[in-house]
Amino acid sequence: MENKKINLDKGYVLVYDFGDVKVHNYNTADYIDDQVILLEKNGKIAVIESPAFYDNNKELEKYIESLGVKLDGVLLSYHMGGGTFLKDSKKYATKKADEYGHIGGGKVLVDNFTKAFGESFDNNIHHVTDYINGGTITLADIKMNIIPTGDAFDIEIPEINFIYTHMLGSDCHSIIAGVDYANAMIDILKGYIEKNYNLILTSHYIPEDIKAVDTKIAYIETLLNIASTCNSKDEMIEKVKEEYPNYSGVNYLEMTAGFFFGE
């Protein structure tokens, strides 16, 4: 569906041109499959999420500069790490997302990634300059609906009928934080189907169409069934890997199993 692919030194950008609005999806090609979304309209740009590695920060800043557009700000939801990226620009987040990134689960992940990846990982936490609430915000002349979630927020972009959420991935494991989380996620994904979004943007996978939502619902339901037959984290991991041998993101599966079995 993308109109153009632009290869950079490390990552690449998929550009989707909808006339008035362009979506630039930056695939960092980093160790954790980070994606960063740029929304462009009327010579302005808004950024959704941040890269997490120093080399990606520089690469994406250079790409944004090459577009010759005015930066309206950065929306930070699930990814508060990478704090040196666009350091002097406006940073928008809900208070819940800010807490998630500074003292909650997001900070735990940053600490873990720092241990795993060392000095290449930018473990600085972004400073939020402007707090937002659920409702609407307009950046780069694009109206966006802010949808609060358990940890942070999703972003609906009605003008192009897109939604941004943390994770999807039709052939990738997801972080599912227990039974209640799984059931809530199924309800959210069914809502996506009802709204029939053109594309689902995420911070860990290239943009996908609505068919990927059906696939993910089936995955979560299977995950719940498998978990109900297991007695340990390791048993769950092995059974899910047997069911989905070609799925990437085994580290996410390991985290999921840890949530299900309290490890």
Please name every model-derived segment.
Residues G249-E263:
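Short, amphipathic C-terminal "tail helix"
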Residues A182-K239, P245-N246:
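Divalent-metal (often Zn2+) His-rich catalytic cores of metallo-beta-lactamase-fold enzymes
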Residues G43-K44, F53-A97, N196:
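Active-site metal-binding motif and surrounding structural segment of the metallo-beta-lactamase
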Residues V15-D17, G82-S89, H102-I103, I137-T138:
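Short loop/helix-cap segments at secondary-structure boundaries that form the rim of catalytic
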